């Protein structure tokens, strides 16, 4: 296993003492070892900047064309590669949260990573996932936001850049920012005649590796293990996590930490379905 994020590589080494090779080192070692066929399976959720860099630069340009054109390569897609993928993952996630979604006084919020560069159009996958989930949930009480894409942050991008307004001032117009998480949860309350204090919120990351974002941006807490009660965990210095914002708004946030619902629900990136790989043979190198 390798990571496209150097942050992940550094954190894994810091926490385990095990140094992980960067991707180019792995690919060179595999090629030098004499393998004839190599499968590269992405763990990315959306086809954003890092996924495209992985497949188009690291795998295609360097490994397949420059370094080892004689090796056949199977390229695995990201989790939400097609509309059918979105539908399948939504069904599995809905079953995972079905009991919580049965009551109007409960809402589930999923935090995706997001892609800051809109040129890739990958963030639409999160909107598609939310739509698919809400078609299954009779109460339309499950929402998807991101930690790194302006329109789908907890508050809109221009407000995120003003620390004094992290909790919106009176007069915030939700209709101007319908895709931010604040607008979604407050509009849900208004539509259903509920005060935030009457609503239970269940938080979970929608990422393949969610350590730092789950702990800091979602929960604002020190490191936790699966199913830990966050009431017993020390708050860290992150003052603007989703959890804290929701609690300041009056919502009741469930205190059970969940780090990886896609894995627990059995929907982990299509790997269980045989990698969903596309095969590129050495004979077809000119067509890549």
Regions of interest found by a model, annotated:
Residues 78-81, 147, 231-276:
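Short, flexible loop segments at boundaries between secondary-structure elements
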Residues 280-288:
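Conserved small/polar residues in nucleotide/adenosyl-binding loops
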Residues 15-28, 180-181:
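Glycine-rich, highly charged phosphate/nucleotide-binding loops
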Residues 7-20, 153-156:
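N-terminal beta-loop-helix "entrance" segment that forms/cooperates
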Residues 114-176:
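Redox- and metal-dependent alpha/beta enzyme cores, enriched for Fe-S-associated oxidoreductases
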Residues 27-84, 90, 94-96, 115, ...:
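Hydrophobic, ordered structural segments
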Residues 1-7, 145-148:
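A short beta-strand-loop structural module common to alpha/beta enzyme folds
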